[in-house]
Amino acid sequence: MIDFVKSRDTVIQKSFFEEFNSQNREMGSFAYSGNSESVWTGENITSIWKTILINETGSYCVAARPMTMDGAEFNLDLMGYSVSEDQINNDEIGIWNYISVAEMGGVLLFLSYWIWTCLHFSKIIFPAQKVICLYIFLFALNQTLQECIEEYVFSSECIKYRQFYSVYEIIDFLRTNFYRLFVIYCALGFGITRTVPKYLMIKGISIVIALCSVYWISLYKDVYVVSEIFDMIQYEVSPAIWVYSICHLLKQCTSVTTYENASKARFFRRMLNAFIFIFCASPMLHYLSNIIFGNFDYRLSVIIGDLFTFMEKIAFPCYIMFPTHNEALAYNRNVAEEAQEKMI
């Protein structure tokens, strides 16, 4: 059913529950101003938000209402799962907020520990291990924005939600592609056992920034075709990068002729095992998260999904690249150099 809601604001942006709750809105058949302009805007899975732009003050906005007059008794179909209003708007919501803050604090604490470790092993640190600090920072910023968006989705306090969500999308796109760039560079050994060629990192980051710029323009200008193309490319490119990295690591592990190469082989073998585990376990973890989402509390499923993401994106890369592993490489490199000098 279609209803008309009277408004005096130039921009109206309310939550799904407030729009459809009959107790919080004005009901009735109002006159519609033909000179006003109404625009419906949805943001991917958060299309429960709507922005209606009005040219003239005192005009009327079109809104939809459920068939039942009791707007509180309905389920929200969110990402294919039925979530009732009581699961999101309840008195115990503060507990989940504290848990979310604890998650962010844990990520920032882990970032601080990683920075301290890099400073402690500064003499034998790899360039790739310094880059991890930037990636963890992007991950923490991305998760923080995600938590803020989830808070604003079900409230009417966010006036510029669309711009806020675009910033989150760009940072998430940047973090994802930066992670893929880091994976392929590590698989090739750059910044670990091979020196980084001049301007190689700059070229890679420039490509990522250029892709982010095009993606941002597509979001800001509502070019959803470009967004869909980018999403399709991401889903196709990511498995290809993982498969190529795994194949290249298999090749690296076969070189065991000297002490140094033996140490490299152990290092790359550890990286190979982690890459295979992440590549195989990632779809299973996401599937398990979706099952939890459909059968348990919405907030609980989000927290478990964040835990899986932390293990996949942060814990395993940091385990592989932990600076204490550098001592074996440095030691065996010196042994190989001394053996070569004795032969000369």
Curated annotation (Swiss-Prot):
Q: Which UniProt keywords apply?
A: Endoplasmic reticulum, Membrane, Transmembrane, Transmembrane helix
Q: Which residues lie on this side of the membrane: Lumenal?
A: 120, 220-222, 295-344
Q: Give me the Gene Ontology terms describing cellular component.
A: endoplasmic reticulum; membrane
Superkingdom = Eukaryota
- Where are the membrane-spanning stretches? 99-119, 121-141, 199-219, 223-243, 274-294
The cellular location(s) given in this protein's UniProt record come to:
Endoplasmic reticulum; Membrane
Membrane topology, record value? Multi-pass membrane protein
Q: Which residues lie toward the Cytoplasmic compartment?
A: 1-98, 142-198, 244-273
Say yes or no: keyword Endoplasmic reticulum present: yes
Give the main localization category: endoplasmic reticulum
**Which InterPro entries did the record assign?**
5TM-prot_SCHPO (IPR018291)
Protein family: Belongs to the UPF0742 family.
What's the protein name?
Uncharacterized membrane protein SPBC1348.02
Protein species of origin = Schizosaccharomyces pombe (strain 972 / ATCC 24843) (Fission yeast)
